[in-house]
Amino acid sequence: MTDQKKLMAVCGHMDQVAGVRQMELQDGRAAGLRCAMIHNGPLELPLMLDKCLDPAWIRYKGINLSLLTKPGLQGRNPYDTAGDEAVRSIMGGAMFTCGLGNVHGNRVVDGVEYPVHGRMRTTPAEKISMDAFWENGEYKILVSGEMREAQIFGENLVLRRTLSLIHI
C-alpha cells in the first residue's frame, strides 16, 4: 500500500507516478485510433478504445511483453472482418479478443459467414469510462467500456470489460 501523504510530498501531480489519459494515434494505418494510455510505475499499456479495449502492448520497465504483428497498429478498416483479408487487420497485442460469435478461422456454416476470430475484435467501445483516484490509501486506475456485436434480426451480444489497476 502506498503512503499517500509521503508520495504526494515528493511529487507535484499523481500523473508523474500513475494514471490514465485518452490519446489518439496520428500517423500511418493507426491514424485516428483512440487509446486509454495507462502508466503505473514501471508498467505501461494502451487499451485500444476502437478495438474492443484490447491492450496493444504491455511494457514493464521499458521491455515489451507482447506481440506486434507485421501489419502493426492500425485503426478499423473496411476489410477488418472480410474473408481472408481479415488477417491484414490482426495487429496482435497483449490480449486479442476472439468471438463472440466464433473463434475459428474464416468459414461459411449453413450459409452464414464467420470471419476469422469473429467480429468483436474490431468493435469500438461505447460507454467508455476512465478514472484514477485515491481510495482507502490505494491509488486506483479504472477503464471500462461496452462492445456490441449485433444485427437487426440476429444476434445481440454485449461484452462489458473493466480493467482495474492499483498503484503499489
Where are these regions (language model features)?
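Surface-exposed acidic/polar loop and edge beta-strand patches at domain peripheries
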Residues: 1-164
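Conserved small/polar residues in nucleotide/adenosyl-binding loops
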Residues: 166-168
